Amino acid sequence: MWKVFQEARLICGLVRANTVTGVPAVTRLFSSTSAGGDGGEPFLAYEKDPGPAFMREDVQQLLKSLTRLELDKVFRKRSVKDNTVEYRFMTDDQLRQELVQSINRAQQMLQMPPVVQAQQDSCRIVSKDGALKALSTAKFVFTDITYGLKNNQRSIVVRHPDGTLQEAPYEMRKRLNQIYFPLNGRSIHTSPMFQDPYLQQLLESGRYEFVLDRACVQYEPYEQEYHQLTARVYQHVNESRAFDALRSTRHFGPFVFFLAWHRLVDDLLLDILKKDYLRNGVELIVLLSTLHGNELQLDAEMKALILEPEMPALFETQEKSIEQLEQDQQFLAVIERYVNAHGTKKVQLNLAIQAYRELANEKLELARGIKRMHGES
């Protein structure tokens, strides 16, 4: 059975390799408008369109690797109607096939919501007909309900009492599209869970994934409310250092992208050091370098190693080999150079680096001693 698991790990690497798909520095923008529109904590917004940077193949590869695919978490029990567990007896070949299918399903479930620029509402005036002025005191809305059109392609216009014919504002378009062509799970009116005090209660209880999943259903990625809500959730996760709540979920990639875009990665880097995810730490630095220019120069061999697809963490981690421990020392040196040059929490990070280096040196000496005892060269 263990042989099957070892072969499955190789299969995982092949699947990962076959399915992997310069932005200048920006200014932090603050607003006092909350997702519910009632005012609240300030949030960070994207000054420029983040879409081109987010969609880059190398950025997507880095974000997927940072997400860390873990089958136990992806396929954990959820609060749904049908949550039964099925047990089957399988041969070794059937188990290999099932593992490959599970990895493919997990990668589909971890597909990241896109990060795009917030849409600006522009209501173009189609015409002004003075002859219709004072014909009625009410507004008339005309909607093209032709079957097969996308919601953003549908013509919706408003006739005002003064005779002006104008394109409908986005909120009205969204409401009418939901009335004529309802999307499952989306409501016409904003749910109270996106407003205080309910939103704050959900954040304090750590229901980050639940809030973000509901936000993906209720809003489009280009809506201003979606940007405000996700920014607030991301900031709360970062301040609470609850990174494991989003790790190995479809929201971890956009979350890391948000932190890297706004240069708020020190707490995440500290968490990566504590959890011995050094490769992810270097990937985070490479992501920063990609978004903000050459933050840190990496040699070609190191960069090629980082951009090489990594095997998903499907099973419990075993003791690292000597080669892996030596590679971790190289990763740690890269992280230390970044911390000394660009870190904002240098004291905490340097202490974590020092503690990790001492422990890693002990493990490396122990591994080399065991190898010498076994007479291996």
Question: Where do the protein language model's features map onto the residues?
Answer:
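A basic, Ser/Thr-enriched alpha-helical scaffold prevalent
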Residues: M1-S377
